Each structure stands twice: as C-alpha cells, then as structure tokens.
C-alpha cells in the first residue's frame, strides 16, 4: 500500500488538520463457524482494536443457537479488548415478549449498546409482524440502551421508494435511535443525497456510512444483488479479466475504498463503519493511512 500512501499523504494531512473532532471508526464481525475461523476472527479483532474504534458489532442469526453464539462472541470480544461491543438484535422469528427477555438479559449482563434491525426474511413466504421501529421502542422502554439502526442510501430492497425509507428512519430516530449505519455503497453521491434528505426531514442523528472492503468482485456482485446496491459500470471495467487474480482485485478494491473514504472526509464525514468480513489487513491499512 506504500504507493497509495505516498499519493494521498499530503491531501489527507491537510484535511485532518481541518477537523475539529477526532475521526472515529467502528467494525462489524460475524460469529465464526468453527475453531479455525474463530482464530481468524480474534486475530482481526486484536489487530483492529489497535485503531481504538468507538464500537465493535457482531451480527445475529434468527435461531436461538445463533443468538447464544452472538452473545458469547460479544462478551469475549469486550473482555479481550475493553471496547464497547454491540450485538445485533433482529425481529425475525421472535415475539415481542421474547425480544423483551433477550434485551433484559443483555442489560443485566452489562451490554449497553445494540444494533436494532428488522432482519432478513428466512423465505419468500415469511410475513413480518415486528419491525425495527417496534424493537427500538421496546428497547428504550426496558433501559437506556445506545441503539444503532440501519439506513439505505440506495433504497431498501422491499421499500416502495426512497421517501418511504426516509420516513421509516425518522420514526426510528424519533423513537430513540442514537445513530444510523448505512448499507454499503460505491456511488458516494447516493450517500450524500441521502444525508441531505435526512437533514431536510429533520432526522437529527448521525448517518454513518457503511464501508465494505473489496476482496473478490464475484463475491461483491452477489452481496450487491442481495442488498439492492448498484455497482458502477466503471467498476466492472476495472475488474474485467481478473477473475483468477484475487491479489490484483484486492489492490484495486483497496484503491476504490480509499477514494470513497477520501471523498467522504472532504464532505465532512468523521465516523465510518466497516463491514470487515472478519478480515483486518486491508481495513487496517486504509484506516491507518487516514489517521484513524
């Protein structure tokens, strides 16, 4: 990454000098499936903890086994690093009474931060009865949790339109959400328009951009298809012919993410949320470069 570091060093330094507050980051992990992936996860956790993030978060499955695994990983990460670690909590396959018991259990066991989400549908026939807004309301009734919620610069796959997403986010903010973390994106203008729209609609919480590192373009296309995230044409051109060259893909992907973060810095963004995929190498390099 030295060649990229040299190119951006002066620009970034000037930008950092103009920031009144320290730039901060948060990192998202998912529970490991086996001992080998668990070792890799905690190796990444330790590495990224050196950046002193304001938050770690751990994703969450709908069944009880996955919930217990999330709780275990959250507690172990916090014990190992001392960094605030938030479990994701979703509404899928859970009643309000079950969610209430989980939230009480979390609070009684020292967890003060939660990422409150509706959750993805397990199948096409599934009908949601409880939504993220309901969960935010429930959490605030139980205790003064610090709550992060989701936001969608390029429209949630199930939303009617962009304004519907904005109104839903405003309801969550008004109900007590402390911040919103966006779905990942590659068109920075989408995030900036969304942020402006939030301001126009009096959404008075921070809209933290979600940043996804690029390791494998085929994998990225699958992620984007599932989440309704658009990939610009120029990205397809950049990765053309590199299907078997993952090392070059990683270098190009790092450059793309660097440009996204750099542009957001110039637009006044000070907090970033990284979807780590339980890896640390690229993210650590990028964050270190920007003084995070």
Curated annotation (Swiss-Prot):
GO terms for cellular component: cytosol. Pathway: One-carbon metabolism; tetrahydrofolate interconversion; Amino-acid biosynthesis; L-methionine biosynthesis via de novo pathway. Coiled coil: none annotated. GO terms for biological process: methionine biosynthetic process; tetrahydrofolate interconversion. (6S)-5-methyl-5,6,7,8-tetrahydrofolate binds at residues 120, 183, 219, 279. SUPFAM superfamilies: FAD-linked oxidoreductase (SSF51730). FAD binds at residues 60, 62, 88, 118-120, 132, 152, 156, 165, 168, 171-172. The keyword Zinc-finger does not apply. Catalyzes the NADH-dependent reduction of 5,10-methylenetetrahydrofolate to 5-methyltetrahydrofolate. Is required to provide the methyl group necessary for methionine synthetase to convert homocysteine to methionine; the methyl group is given by 5-methyltetrahydrofolate. This is 5,10-methylenetetrahydrofolate reductase. It comes from Buchnera aphidicola subsp. Schizaphis graminum (strain Sg).
